[in-house]
């Protein structure tokens, strides 16, 4: 039995293409892997605090007493990391906003990236500590950006996930959604076909 963690990060709730596709992924996964456990965390409905000068102090090893706000941030960081490490498959629904990921997803990464916990520095360079996992990124875009200079989502997520130890990463693209109903329907159809292929593996 596998454990699947789904991270939603769109601010558009039910209107979101990435949310709809991640819901489709969950439906298909449950149909093919009924014994698996699926956890869904909506980072827009339950937002993560923005990292600032006070909160960053909670995430660094120190003997200094923590403020109540820092204690809350550290507890949330511990919770998010424990959840991440406890799951085998990580599904990230990542819409493109202004060429990059949403603020909601970036805030999550800022609390998950902790030296000595999810990665460490060694004499040979950084080493990821979140290993043995697979990641599937479902990314929706209004325009066509794949393999072009305006796609900052794909390299960023590949780099971040690899940095913490998740190197088995597959991407599902839904592009051209803003180009009209016909193009949007094709984007959804192509993305669902890619999801079907991944689920069937």
UniProtKB/Swiss-Prot annotation:
Catalytic activity, EC: 1.6.5.-, 1.7.1.17
Binding-site positions, FMN: 10, 16-18, 96-99, 140-143
InterPro entries linked: Flavodoxin_fold, Flavoprotein-like_sf, FMN-dep_NADH:Q_OxRdtase_AzoR1, NADH:quinone_OxRdtase_FMN_depd
Cofactor(s), names only, from the UniProt record: FMN
Cofactor note: Binds 1 FMN per subunit.
Record GO terms (molecular function): electron transfer activity; FMN binding; oxidoreductase activity, acting on NAD(P)H as acceptor; oxidoreductase activity, acting on NAD(P)H, quinone or similar compound as acceptor
Domain of life according to the entry: Bacteria
Known catalytic reactions: 2 a quinone + NADH + H(+) = 2 a 1,4-benzosemiquinone + NAD(+); N,N-dimethyl-1,4-phenylenediamine + anthranilate + 2 NAD(+) = 2-(4-dimethylaminophenyl)diazenylbenzoate + 2 NADH + 2 H(+)
A Pfam family the protein falls into: Flavodoxin_2
The keyword RNA-binding belongs to this UniProt entry's keyword annotation: no
EC main group: oxidoreductase
Family listed: Belongs to the azoreductase type 1 family.
Function: Quinone reductase that provides resistance to thiol-specific stress caused by electrophilic quinones. Also exhibits azoreductase activity. Catalyzes the reductive cleavage of the azo bond in aromatic azo compounds to the corresponding amines.
Quaternary assembly: Homodimer.
Full protein name: FMN-dependent NADH:quinone oxidoreductase
Originating gene: azoR
């Amino acid at each position: 039995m596998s454990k699947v963690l789904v991270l939603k990060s769109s601010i558009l709730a039910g209107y979101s293409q990435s949310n709809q596709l991640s819901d489709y992924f969950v439906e298909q996964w449950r149909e093919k892997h009924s014994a698996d456990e699926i956890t869904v965390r909506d980072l827009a409905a339950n937002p993560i605090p923005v990292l600032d000068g006070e909160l960053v102090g909670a995430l660094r090893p120190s003997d200094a007493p923590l403020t109540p706000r820092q204690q809350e941030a550290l507890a949330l960081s511990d919770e998010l990391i424990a959840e991440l490490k406890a799951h085998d498959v990580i599904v990230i629904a990542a819409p493109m906003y202004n060429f990059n990921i949403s603020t909601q997803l970036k805030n999550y990464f800022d609390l998950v990236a902790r030296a000595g916990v999810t990665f460490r520095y060694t004499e040979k360079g950084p080493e990821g500590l979140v290993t043995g996992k697979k990641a599937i990124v479902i990314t929706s875009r209004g325009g066509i950006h794949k393999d072009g200079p305006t796609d900052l989502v794909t390299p960023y997520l590949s780099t971040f996930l690899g940095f913490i130890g998740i190197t088995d990463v597959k991407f599902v693209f839904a592009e051209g959604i803003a180009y009209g109903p016909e193009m949007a329907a094709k984007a959804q159809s192509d993305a669902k076909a890619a999801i079907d292929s991944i689920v069937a593996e």
